Amino acid sequence: MPPKKAAPKKLHELAPEVRVGLKIDDISKKTYIVGKQFATGGFGRIHTCTEDGKSQQMVMKIEPSTNGPLLTEVVVFNRILKKDMIENYKKAKKIQWIGLPHLIANGYFTYNNEKMRYMIIPKYATSLEAVREANGGSLSAKDSLTVADCVLGALEYLHDSDYAHADVKAANILLEKPNDFSSAVLVDFGLAHRTTNNVDKPDKKRAHNGTCIFTSTDAHRGNNPSFRGDVEILAYNLIMWISGSLPWLSLEASPDKVFEAKQKFVGGLPGTLQSILTNQPAPVAGCITTMFDVSRKTDYTHKVDMAKLRKKVTEAAQSASTGAQKKPKMTPSRDTTATPKRKSQRAPRVESEDEEEEEKKEVEIKPKKKVQRSRKVVEDDDEEEEVIIPKSTRSRKTKEEGTPRSFNLGMTSSTATSDRVAKKIEMKYKRLATNKPSLVPVTVADASSCESQYESNEPGPSSRVVKKRTSEERDANGEVQLKTPALVSPDVKKTKYKSGISSATKASPTELRRVPGVRNFPKGRRSMIIKETSARYQEKRATRNTKPTFDDSSCSSEV
């Protein structure tokens, strides 16, 4: 009886959708909350996630526990991509940065009676593939070589750890910062292979493993991933990034034909490469040719001299940058028919339409801004007072030229006397501004009463003789026009100002202390003000009761 045939291997299944907000407990007693799904990789789903109680977002890959790709990746992370391992490597090599992610957490959880495997790694800004598509399907030579240098550094770490990546492509390269190509990080280790047991023995079952248009000729033959294969894969990617196409791109559905096209291309170097990169400096094509030469001359099980390759890539990037600065307009537009994904040719710099619209709005709005200028209000023939009107006020417009304002004080006095009274009023307001309690501003009516006493022939207490005014100095109404200084309040009227506080109240310390305005003064100052004010008004009342004489000080201090 013939032996039974082995049961066919179960194909990988796509992971079921996991609801947002699901909490997963880690073996380290940390809780992670599943976020929204933003991508699908292989047979798994890729979600954002956060640690419970924290806001920093991370990436969680979820697959059924029976699937192999995520298991392979978890094994690689646990063996060589833990955070402390990467830090020790950087210290040993004396480097500050390396383009590889580190493992945060991994494990199992049950969802709808199905066992699921998960892995958590850091979250990055964007993928190189998204940037390439946004740029019309290609990148500049300088940016492409900058990314290649980062990838070579990551591959050097993997090769030193006896692992080959086997799936280098733009979709598996992430940027830590948008448009910062020097921060490229190599991810997705689902096809990574440990090379310690590699033997140059092709197996048809493994033929064409990887991404068909980029995979190495070793993989097309059926060999396991190798160190030289990673360099060859990166060289194919550089051609795709710079030119936007590959000669075998339309043959992707037929892996055997792709393999034949690659063999012809590599056999015809450097001429076949120069025919594609016609508009690039010679060092750029020379750098990629060197990568193909190294991959062909290196033995299947031997490691590649990454330091030599990185030096060549750096020199080519510098020459590409210099050539772009010298001739920025000489690069013709590329043929977009070779790459189906490319829709339109765009500028190298990635800029969203929203940012362009905002810049246009700012340019349109700026000329419309009105500059508020100061206006001058004429207060006198000789002096002008500049008044700066704030934007928020809506005051009436004042003419720059016109008749000076004047107040009719209703008194007959000479020009010199009226100027003297005006100066007294000005001095009173200045002293009032210094919070001197013994000074009270006078009104125009008080000044008028004082002038009427100055006109008498009887000498007052001030023993000053004042000449009477002549009728020639008066206007048609018998009044004198006095131009008020800026310190005189425009609300001054002819009538006597009434404060609402009687002289009897001011003369009584007890009553004066009860006045609300007096309470605003500090205690020590309040007592001094009450004492001075009551003493002055008591003396004034006593003088009025005994002999009605003229007191010059009362003219300037009585309210």
Swiss-Prot record:
<dbReference type="GO" id="GO:0001708">
    <property type="term" value="P:cell fate specification"/>
</dbReference>
<dbReference type="InterPro" id="IPR050235">
    <property type="entry name" value="CK1_Ser-Thr_kinase"/>
</dbReference>
<dbReference type="GO" id="GO:0005634">
    <property type="term" value="C:nucleus"/>
</dbReference>
<feature type="compositionally biased region" description="Polar residues">
    <location>
        <begin position="449"/>
        <end position="460"/>
    </location>
</feature>
<keyword id="KW-0067">ATP-binding</keyword>
<keyword id="KW-0217">Developmental protein</keyword>
<dbReference type="GO" id="GO:0007165">
    <property type="term" value="P:signal transduction"/>
</dbReference>
<feature type="active site" description="Proton acceptor">
    <location>
        <position position="167"/>
    </location>
</feature>
<dbReference type="GO" id="GO:0005524">
    <property type="term" value="F:ATP binding"/>
</dbReference>
<dbReference type="InterPro" id="IPR000719">
    <property type="entry name" value="Prot_kinase_dom"/>
</dbReference>
<dbReference type="GO" id="GO:0007163">
    <property type="term" value="P:establishment or maintenance of cell polarity"/>
</dbReference>
<keyword id="KW-0539">Nucleus</keyword>
<dbReference type="GO" id="GO:0005635">
    <property type="term" value="C:nuclear envelope"/>
</dbReference>
<dbReference type="GO" id="GO:0004674">
    <property type="term" value="F:protein serine/threonine kinase activity"/>
</dbReference>
<keyword id="KW-0808">Transferase</keyword>
<dbReference type="GO" id="GO:0005737">
    <property type="term" value="C:cytoplasm"/>
</dbReference>
<dbReference type="GO" id="GO:0008406">
    <property type="term" value="P:gonad development"/>
</dbReference>
<feature type="compositionally biased region" description="Polar residues">
    <location>
        <begin position="405"/>
        <end position="418"/>
    </location>
</feature>
<dbReference type="GO" id="GO:0000785">
    <property type="term" value="C:chromatin"/>
</dbReference>
<feature type="domain" description="Protein kinase">
    <location>
        <begin position="32"/>
        <end position="388"/>
    </location>
</feature>
<dbReference type="InterPro" id="IPR011009">
    <property type="entry name" value="Kinase-like_dom_sf"/>
</dbReference>
<feature type="region of interest" description="Disordered">
    <location>
        <begin position="448"/>
        <end position="559"/>
    </location>
</feature>
<dbReference type="GO" id="GO:0006974">
    <property type="term" value="P:DNA damage response"/>
</dbReference>
<feature type="binding site">
    <location>
        <position position="61"/>
    </location>
    <ligand>
        <name>ATP</name>
    </ligand>
</feature>
<feature type="compositionally biased region" description="Basic and acidic residues">
    <location>
        <begin position="533"/>
        <end position="542"/>
    </location>
</feature>
<dbReference type="InterPro" id="IPR008271">
    <property type="entry name" value="Ser/Thr_kinase_AS"/>
</dbReference>
<comment type="function">
    <text>Serine/threonine kinase that phosphorylates baf-1, thus regulating the association of baf-1 with chromatin and nuclear membrane proteins during nuclear envelope formation. May act through the egl-17 signaling pathway. Essential in hermaphrodites for formation of the vulva, uterus, and uterine seam cells and for development and maintenance of the somatic gonad and thus the germ line. Acts to prevent cep-1 from triggering an inappropriate cell cycle arrest, thereby promoting germ cell proliferation.</text>
</comment>
<keyword id="KW-0963">Cytoplasm</keyword>
<feature type="binding site">
    <location>
        <begin position="38"/>
        <end position="46"/>
    </location>
    <ligand>
        <name>ATP</name>
    </ligand>
</feature>
<dbReference type="Pfam" id="PF00069">
    <property type="entry name" value="Pkinase"/>
</dbReference>
<dbReference type="GO" id="GO:0040036">
    <property type="term" value="P:regulation of fibroblast growth factor receptor signaling pathway"/>
</dbReference>
<keyword id="KW-0723">Serine/threonine-protein kinase</keyword>
<dbReference type="GO" id="GO:0106310">
    <property type="term" value="F:protein serine kinase activity"/>
</dbReference>
<feature type="region of interest" description="Disordered">
    <location>
        <begin position="315"/>
        <end position="419"/>
    </location>
</feature>
<protein>
    <recommendedName>
        <fullName>Serine/threonine-protein kinase VRK1</fullName>
        <ecNumber>2.7.11.1</ecNumber>
    </recommendedName>
</protein>
<feature type="compositionally biased region" description="Polar residues">
    <location>
        <begin position="545"/>
        <end position="559"/>
    </location>
</feature>
<comment type="similarity">
    <text>Belongs to the protein kinase superfamily. CK1 Ser/Thr protein kinase family. VRK subfamily.</text>
</comment>
<dbReference type="GO" id="GO:0015030">
    <property type="term" value="C:Cajal body"/>
</dbReference>
<keyword id="KW-0418">Kinase</keyword>
<keyword id="KW-0597">Phosphoprotein</keyword>
<keyword id="KW-0547">Nucleotide-binding</keyword>
